[in-house]
């Protein structure tokens, strides 16, 4: 018996991180859209499919192809802790454009990804309720949870709101079960060549310098020991959330000596200990074995396969990576959604 193919519309597709996960789970993307031209170029390069570049609001939603699923992550700067957290930011309205596509196409299911703050903070309670009320009016049962990508085969701590809606079937809504194993950054980064050679492209040369007035925490990997917003990566844990603002002094960095030898002297721990004692660290020279992660390394920490190609300038590529949904995370979500489709069809044919 031929396996049924479930079709999907991908919105706010970016470079295609979420698409990659849903495609690997078995969904067929029949229409995709993003506003950013370089992200669209990356999408075409990797998937060989046409992606419609431009504002989603420029398209006639009724004319989009029929589909079983709509998925995507509307731009989240208006809800993001890293942004201004302004519900009146025009980009905050795009969650409602996503909803309008769902209303026009009436898929069996939708999956929307966004920042955790949209699901947690009282500040956005009105936005949440407006979304839920309209989905209920459209006949969709909806559940949402804040999930952390590190629990789903991704070497990065990245909390995200995942909202799943199904037409008239709340009992069938499933979220993925955690894999039970976290992936430390070291496990991903140790396989790379030297920056700028072989499999390790897109080196970031932004200078790393110690802060004159460091913000200290109990861990050397928290607080702000250095100028700029880039923080060191603890190689023995999944890395911190990678920002879309990477490419300059906001790019995280690693101790390559510890990467090669976990028993090597921990320079960062020593610097942190000095700062805790009140020592002025602002004139301490940062050694050359402390360096910022490359584009290739950032992509790997985001869960992209090594053969995934990014287009545009180095900053374009960092931005595309930081804006992406980690593909392994997306694949686990998509697999849970696929089970919902299969369960529905099993009942229909029994």
Predicted regions and their residues:
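Class I SAM-dependent methyltransferase "Motif I" SAM/SAH-binding loop
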Residues: 11-15
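Conserved SAM-binding strand-loop segment of SAM-dependent methyltransferases
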Residues: 48-55
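Short beta-strand element of Class I
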Residues: 28-30
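Glycine-rich SAM-binding Motif I of class I
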Residues: 16, 20
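Conserved SAM-binding loop
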Residues: 43-44
């Amino acid at each position: 018996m031929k396996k049924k193919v479930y079709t999907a519309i991908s919105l706010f597709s970016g470079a295609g991180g979420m698409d990659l996960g849903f495609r690997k789970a078995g969904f067929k993307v029949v229409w995709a859209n993003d506003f950013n031209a370089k992200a669209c170029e990356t999408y075409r390069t990797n998937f060989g499919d046409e992606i419609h570049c431009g504002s989603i609001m420029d398209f006639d939603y009724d004319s989009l192809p029929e589909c079983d699923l709509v998925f995507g992550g509307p731009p989240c700067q208006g809800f993001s802790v890293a942004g201004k957290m302004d519900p009146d930011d025009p980009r905050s309205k795009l969650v409602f454009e996503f909803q309008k596509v769902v209303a026009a196409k009436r898929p069996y299911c939708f999956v929307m990804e966004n920042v955790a703050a949209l699901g947690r903070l009282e500040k956005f309670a009105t936005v949440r309720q407006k979304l839920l009320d309209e989905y209920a009016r459209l006949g969709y049962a909806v559940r949402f949870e804040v999930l952390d990508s590190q629990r789903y085969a991704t070497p990065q701590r990245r909390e995200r709101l995942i909202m799943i809606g199904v037409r008239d079937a709340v009992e069938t809504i499933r979220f993925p079960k955690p894999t039970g194993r976290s992936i430390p950054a070291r496990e991903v980064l140790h396989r790379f060549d030297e920056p700028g050679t072989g499999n390790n492209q897109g080196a970031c040369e932004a200078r790393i310098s110690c802060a004159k007035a460091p913000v200290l925490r109990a861990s050397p990997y928290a607080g702000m020991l250095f100028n700029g917003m880039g923080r060191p990566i603890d190689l023995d844990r999944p890395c911190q959330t990678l920002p879309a603002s990477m490419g300059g002094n906001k790019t995280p960095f690693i101790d390559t000596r510890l990467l090669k030898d976990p028993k090597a002297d921990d320079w960062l721990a020593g610097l942190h200990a000095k700062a805790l004692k009140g020592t002025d660290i602002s004139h301490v020279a940062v050694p050359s074995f402390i360096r910022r992660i490359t584009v290739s390394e950032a992509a790997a920490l985001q869960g992209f396969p090594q053969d995934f190609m990014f287009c545009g300038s180095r900053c374009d590529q960092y931005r595309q990576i930081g804006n992406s949904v980690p593909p392994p995370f997306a694949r686990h979500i998509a697999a849970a959604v696929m089970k919902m489709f299969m369960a529905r069809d099993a009942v229909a044919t029994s």
